[in-house]
């Protein structure tokens, strides 16, 4: 596990909204810079505290085997949402990165709830704030994300991603729940956050 600079984002404070050009860079640059940013869907959301990077050369990426109807959005322009169903149960949301055709994306794994918390509690059917968005399926349910959001731009309603304020202390480690390229240290998180899906070691 590696760590970078120390400083914490202020939960609830919003930086300027990110535009699509922010995502037109290497997935390995975008992923850590999303830590501390705020993801909102129709005003409901929170601070991003955990993400995973998936590059098109990565055997664990959905795009690794080529374009299909399911992953077509990954091959499109950067700055759009790629939504898929995991294990036939949970929706997961990714942000498409790099140049069109590069087919790389960042999976949003966990949020610290800050906006519309009561709406999240109603959707999730629980009160514990720490459990509302501590996993990709949980956060998608809490924010009301479904396949209807697949292919939508991230810089226009219902989405908004606001730039982080300050430079958070970021930790890295191997990704979770995959069997291919499981040792790649492409999982990024906010150091010390109790809202991540699984603690970093």
Curated annotation (Swiss-Prot):
Family per record: Belongs to the DNA glycosylase MPG family.
Top-level taxon: Bacteria
Gene Ontology biological-process entries: base-excision repair
Membrane spanning residue stretches: none
Keywords of the record: DNA damage, DNA repair, Hydrolase
An example Gene Ontology molecular-function term: DNA binding
Enzyme Commission number(s) of this protein: 3.2.2.-
InterPro entries in the cross-refs: Formyl_transferase-like_C_sf (IPR011034), MPG (IPR003180), MPG_sf (IPR036995)
Protein name: Putative 3-methyladenine DNA glycosylase
Presence of the UniProt keyword Hydrolase in the record: yes
Species of the source: Rhodopseudomonas palustris (strain HaA2)
Annotated NCBIfam families: 3mg, PRK00802.1-3
